[in-house]
C-alpha cells in the first residue's frame, strides 16, 4: 500500500422515468437529478417540472453543488442551406462542398459564476446524440432519422457550480440565470434568433 489509500467500491443506483409521451424524462442517482427532453418547447414548462421534482425530493436534497441546463439542436441542410441557419463564423470551410467532411468549433465563456460551453459540429453523416448523453431512454425527434446528411449539431451546456444548501428561491434564480446565458450563446450561433 505504501500509505496510499485503497479505493473502495461505491454502489450507484440510477433511476430513470419518462412521461407518457416518451419525450421527457428524469435521470436520478445518488449524486444528481437530470431532466432530459427531446421535445423542448418552453423553458418555463421545463423549469417548472424540474423544480417540482426537486421540491418533492427536498428531504433528500441537502446540498447543491451543480445546476445545469444543456440543449442540443440539429440543423439539416434540406430545405435551407446551413449558411441560412448558422452564423458564418461557425461554418469553417463548409462552402467547399465537393470534399467537405467536418468542422468543429468549441467555446467556453464564464460570467457571474455561470460556465457556458458551446460546441458547433458540422458534418456529413448520420445525426446522433453525443456519446455522453443518455439518449436511449427517450423517443428521438424526427430530425434524428438515421439518414446521413449534411447537418450542424449545436450543443450548449450552461451550468453553475458551488456549494449551497437547498433553497427553492435560489434554485429558481440560478436556473433562470443559466437559461438566460444559454439562450444568449445559442442566439450567437443561429441565424433565426429565439
Model-derived features: positions:
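N-terminal low-complexity, intrinsically disordered segments
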Residues: 1-28, 166, 170
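Charged, terminal alpha-helix-loop-beta segments
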Residues: 1-8, 32-34, 68, 194
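Aromatic/basic-lined ligand-recognition segments
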Residues: 11-18, 64-145
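Glycine-rich, often proline-containing surface loops adjacent to acidic residues and nearby aromatics
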Residues: 24-39, 63-72, 148-161
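Conserved aromatic-histidine-acidic binding/catalytic patches
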Residues: 34-45, 166, 170, 174
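Secondary-structure boundary elements
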Residues: 42-44, 48-63
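Residue-level signal for secondary-structure boundary sites
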Residues: 43, 77, 162-164
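Long, compositionally biased interface segments
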Residues: 148-194
Amino acid at each position: 500500500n505504501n500509505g496510499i489509500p485503497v479505493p473502495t467500491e461505491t454502489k450507484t443506483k440510477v433511476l430513470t422515468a419518462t412521461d407518457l409521451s416518451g419525450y421527457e424524462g428524469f435521470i436520478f442517482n445518488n449524486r444528481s437529478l437530470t431532466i432530459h427532453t427531446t421535445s423542448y418547447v418552453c423553458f418555463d414548462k421545463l423549469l417548472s417540472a424540474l423544480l417540482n421534482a426537486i421540491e418533492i425530493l427536498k428531504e433528500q436534497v441537502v446540498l447543491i453543488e451543480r445546476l445545469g441546463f444543456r440543449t442540443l439542436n440539429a440543423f439539416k441542410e434540406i430545405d435551407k442551406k446551413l449558411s441560412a441557419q448558422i452564423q458564418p463564423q461557425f461554418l469553417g470551410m463548409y462552402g467547399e462542398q465537393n470534399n467537405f467532411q467536418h468542422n468543429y468549433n468549441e467555446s467556453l465563456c464564464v460570467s457571474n459564476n455561470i460556465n457556458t460551453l458551446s460546441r458547433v459540429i458540422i458534418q456529413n453523416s448520420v445525426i446522433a446524440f453525443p456519446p455522453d448523453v443518455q439518449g436511449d431512454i427517450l423517443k428521438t425527434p424526427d430530425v434524428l432519422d438515421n439518414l446521413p446528411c449534411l447537418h450542424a449539431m449545436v450543443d450548449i451546456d450552461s451550468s453553475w457550480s458551488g456549494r449551497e444548501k437547498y433553497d427553492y428561491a435560489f434554485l429558481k434564480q440560478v436556473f433562470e440565470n443559466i437559461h438566460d446565458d444559454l439562450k444568449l450563446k445559442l442566439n450567437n450561433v443561429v441565424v433565426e434568433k429565439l
